[in-house]
A protein has these predicted regions:
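ALDH superfamily catalytic-core signature
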Residues: 251, 259-400, 463, 507-512, ...
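Residue-level signal for inorganic ion chemistry
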Residues: 62, 98, 120, 142, ...
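Low-acidity, Ser/Thr- and Arg-rich intrinsically disordered low-complexity segments
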Residues: 3-16, 21-28, 38
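Short loop/turn microsegments at loop-to-beta-strand junctions
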Residues: 51-54, 315, 437
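Short, well-ordered beta-strand elements within core beta-sheets of diverse protein domains
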Residues: 64-71, 85-92, 177, 285-287, ...
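Rossmann-like NAD(P) dinucleotide-binding subdomain of oxidoreductase/dehydrogenase enzymes
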Residues: 110, 154-295, 420
Length: 518
């Protein structure tokens, strides 16, 4: 008998339910034997200050994992000042020396991969396979910038009328970052690693849903030998984030919603601080009539349901040419029905819970709105389990523009499919959005690939593949999907001051500069 795709979590072993314990910054399913359990992150003071606190909830069970103190404005500024002090020595190291720390950091991540992955899954519900892959990707990024960062930072020699002309790259200072919960380690690492190799120091305020994953990164950097103050985590809420933006940082980075990005940009503009914003996405997935439909259907499942659909670069709007729409829909539905919803700690699970009740209710509201306006539910369509914040993988057909699932960013396991008369219409409909992060186009006419990529209004276009982030390629969007780029040399250059130097005959020190830049 075939197992239902909406599998019960009630059969999970008892060590995966109820209270989870934390020791030494790592979550475990059981308390260590004969060990008294506590969750302090620092030695208790004889004169403790009272903090507001928040609770982290396991989205698979609804149980509380731990309470965390909300950092005050004074504490945030103290962290930034510590980062400023660390910057003096860190920025004066050779890039090759800074790279050594990043390579050690990658080793530490791999060493603690299993523990870090379990923490991530407990905090935000990501299935354990994807959590492990996320830690591995963080290590890859650290290796990549450790191996390539020094070359990226070498001066560019330019031929001008001067005896010697070059472009130099210098660190900006302390960089402040506000990061989300959906990729709680990767989002931080892909910002912090290029920032650090460039000679900056970093203070990160992680999402309140996943603070321990961020603290684990702080621990990993410490174990790798990074100088104290070069990378710090400050845990808290919106007031903490505001305090970080207003602190004396040189750059503010945010990964979040369009509305939040606009608020951060306004706040940062008061002091003319540079911003790097990776904002919302409603990526189109376009299927041409000559597409390999089997490959496209498998790609649609992978592109839509990674991280339970909670990804800025997940495929969120599906435009399929009429002549193949029914066949594609059938293949898409067939692949979706194989997805197993269940305990995210179970390696056989494909879809875990959404991060919160609020997120689950938002997705449910978007589906109800679509159905009320004429959409047809082909697969799923309702809550998947009474315990935790589950929602079934859902496929909608007969979707129209007036439905929220097309107008808004749908941050969950819902795939709306729109049939269109031709490829030109598909591209026009795909571009009819405030978002422009990524796009996926499926066609066997590779002669048109470059032209199609040019026509789609997005920062990233993948032909016959799903959108992903890769340390070797720039990541970012257009329109309301962001400002600036992350990853690759282009992302690293967002985090440096670019200095023009021209030396004419007779300038003091000309020979020394020539030697340095050759």
């Amino acid at each position: 008998m075939q197992t239902s795709p909406i599998a019960s979590i009630g059969s999970a072993s008892s060590d995966r339910v109820g209270v989870h314990w934390m020791t030494k910054h790592i979550w475990c399913r059981r308390p260590p034997c004969n060990e008294r359990i506590s969750v302090p992150r620092r030695k208790p003071s004889r004169h403790p200050t009272k903090h507001r606190t928040f609770s982290v909830i396991n989205p698979a069970t609804g149980d509380s994992l731990a309470m965390y103190p909300i950092a005050t404005q004074t504490e945030v500024r103290a962290k930034v000042e510590k980062a400023r002090e660390a910057f003096r020595s860190w920025s004066n190291l050779e890039a090759e020396d800074r790279a050594t720390y990043l390579l050690h950091f990658a080793e530490v991540l791999r060493k603690h991969k299993a523990d870090y992955a379990e923490t991530m899954t407990l905090e935000m519900g990501k299935i354990i396979r994807e959590s492990i892959a996320e830690v591995e990707k963080c290590a890859w990024a650290a290796d990549y910038f450790g191996q390539n960062g020094p070359a990226f930072l070498r001066p560019d020699v330019v031929a001008t009328d001067a005896m010697r002309s070059y472009v130099a790259f210098h660190p900006r200072g302390v960089l402040g970052s506000i990061m989300p919960w959906n990729f709680p380690m990767w989002q931080i690492v892909r910002f912090a690693v290029p920032a650090l190799i460039a000679g900056n120091t970093v203070v990160v305020k992680p999402a309140s849903a996943s603070p321990q994953s961020a603290l684990n990164l702080e621990m990993a950097f410490r174990e790798a030998g990074l100088p104290e103050g070069a990378f710090q985590i400050v845990v808290g809420d919106r007031t903490t984030a505001t305090a970080l933006i207003r602190a004396p940082v040189s750059v503010v980075s945010l990964t979040g919603s369009v509305a939040t990005g606009a608020q951060v940009a306004r706040e940062a503009s008061r002091d003319l601080k540079k911003v790097i914003l990776e904002l919302g996405g409603s990526d189109p997935f376009i299927v041409a009539r000559d597409a390999d439909l089997d490959a496209a259907a498998k790609g649609a499942v992978a592109g839509r349901f990674v991280n339970g659909g909670q990804s800025c670069i997940a495929a969120k709007r599906f435009f399929v040419v009429d002549s193949v729409a029914q066949e594609f829909l059938a293949k898409f539905a067939e692949n979706m029905r194989r997805l197993r919803v269940g305990d995210p700690l179970d390696p056989s699970t494909d879809i875990g819970p959404l991060v919160s009740r609020t997120q689950r209710d938002e997705i449910e509201g978007q589906v109800k709105d679509a159905v009320a306006k004429g959409a047809k539910v082909e697969v799923g369509g309702k809550r998947g389990h009474r315990a935790g914040w589950y929602f079934e993988p859902t496929l909608l057909s007969h979707v129209t523009k007036n439905m929220r699932v097309l107008r808004e960013e749908t941050f969950g396991p819902v795939a709306p499919v729109v049939a269109v008369p031709d490829l030109d219409t598909a591209i026009r409909e795909a571009n009819d959005s405030e978002f422009g992060l990524g796009a996926s186009v499926w066609t066997q006419d590779l002669g048109r690939a470059d032209e199609l990529a040019k026509q789609v209004e997005s920062g990233m276009v993948f032909i016959n593949g799903i959108v992903k982030s890769d340390p070797r390629m720039p990541f970012g969007g257009v329109k309301h999907s962001g400002v600036g780029r992350e990853l690759s040399r282009y992302g690293l250059l967002e985090m440096v001051n670019i200095k023009t130097v021209e030396i004419f005959p007779g300038s003091p020190g000309a020979s020394a500069v020539r030697k340095e830049t050759e």
